[in-house]
Amino acid sequence: MSLLYLTFLFPLLGWLVLAFSLGRFGERTSALIGVGSIGLSALTTLWVGIDFLGNPPEGGVYVQRLWQWMAVGNFTPSFSLALDGLSLTMLGVVTGVGFFIHLFASWYMRGEEGYSRFFTYTNLFIASMLFLVLADDLLFVYLGWEGVGLCSYLLIGFYYKDRKNGAAALKAFVVTRVGDVFLAIGLFILYRELGTLNIHELLVRAPTLFAEGSPALSLACLMLLGGAVGKSAQLPLQTWLADAMAGPTPVSALIHAATMVTAGVYLIARTHGLFLLAPEILHLVGLVGAITLVLAGFAALVQTDIKRILAYSTMSQIGYMFLALGVGAWEGAIFHLMTHAFFKALLFLSAGAVIVACHHEQNIFKMGGLRKSLPLVYACFLVGGSALAALPLVTSGFYSKDAILWQVEASGQSALLWAGLVGAFLTSLYTFRLIFIAFHGKEQTKAHAGHGLAHHLPLLVLLVLSTGIGALITPPLAGVLPAGPGDHIEEGRHALEITSGIIAIAGIVLAAFLFLGERRLATSIANSAPGRLLSTLWFNAWGFDWLYDQLWVKPYLLATRLVGQDPLDWMMGLPAWFALRGNQLLAWTVTGKLRWYAASMGIGAVLVLALLLLG
């Protein structure tokens, strides 16, 4: 376990080497460094994990103190790494899934301008995420938090020559910064009240210093939730995620499966002891997840861009994790985080293969019949889509989503359970809508299948992990997180499993009925007046972008224009204005005509005499 620091040091070194090369390396060298550094990190994680599970440290936590960062009064943050079952699970997801995404990216990005720059950014992305999950102090968690935010901005705007991509990157950066401000305020409150930001010390001190429902702690947890919803794209800071599809497809896989959007879930799970003392805020976590998963499900139903459909599905699945956290199903949330990483990475990488095969076409209605020309990718979409839809017994997604739904039912919160079941139906419907439209029906474009180890291996490994085999990998969370409300109850569980399975299959059957064949019924529904209204509303993600534009963007721009007109500048400019106007008046009197001058002299003489007489 003493090699723990190498897990994030390898990606950090990869970033430094690629950054200082200034793009001089060729594609082969850049890929070797970029992919190799993540591979070494994954191997180190495997070694550390075997050692940790075989020789558990005392107390279940191994702390590696590297150095003290600063000492200002009582504020003495130490640069330390903490390894327990939760951070080990996150390490495995980030490095394991991240490695296969990098390997696939080495194929996907071939021939692209900025090949070396791409791996420079992704290595820093992985290093920042690893720093986030290993830090034993919320201050260092925040540094990693900001690191993944910066890297997401760089990667979403990777094709920066297109102004739309730059705007999407800026939008993601600004919206997530709103959440980051809330998180920073939460850290300030915690340090003021508890005198430390060390996670272990926080969880020990909070129960002794705060009563349940304490206003100060509730406010701190609310601020932490604000940071989590921003980074994990939950209501009301969810608007950036769909636009983040502007980046290369492997970036989407990294953000959605292995790194950024899972950070909010990790933060709440890591600080669970604080949220347990603020039950109203914990309930709000579940409510946010329930609303988000339903709204995102409807939005995904009408999208035409293959990546945006998957983006809204991520928003919905993260909603399930928040739902689990909100009812105290801590292990269920992390289990679903892990399985979701498997099948969502598979789906995004498969989508990338489809996009390349179809000459960078992303509209599913311009595809069709791809199952014949892309049999491997079709199989990956079937397995990954089935896991996303939680097809019973054979997929990893079924076991993790069922664990969440059971804990929600055991908690007695029926409204949240209904939201989860509605979301399950919508998920299977929009997932197989995508599959049936893109891979069945009439062929719309001539596709060419990808080839090579870097293309096939990641897809095949993730395909296997998306089946029920992936569910056999259980996160080592015993003793790290509290038991959920349904951990010791079995009565009624099988009935819920059957119900959720029927719902998933019903969604697939309805998708087949609507989108296989001529699709006349689906077309007639879409062209009806209610259909057009709802599809417009859902396509625009319930109008949140428009609403925020009216509430925040336009008033802000108006305020900048008003502030730009500085009254002091205006007053200081008055003498110059009068001088200019006087000069213009005098210039107007210069006509060059003798009669005008004589008349002017006469008028002037009369005015002088009048003044003398009046005086």
Please state what every model-predicted region is.
Residues 36-54, 179-189, 382-389, 458-475, ...:
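Hydrophobic alpha-helical membrane-insertion segments
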Residues 8-23, 99-100, 229, 293:
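N-terminal signal-anchor/start-transfer transmembrane helix
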Residues 86, 96, 100-141, 150-451, ...:
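Hydrophobic transmembrane alpha-helices and their helix-loop junctions in integral membrane proteins
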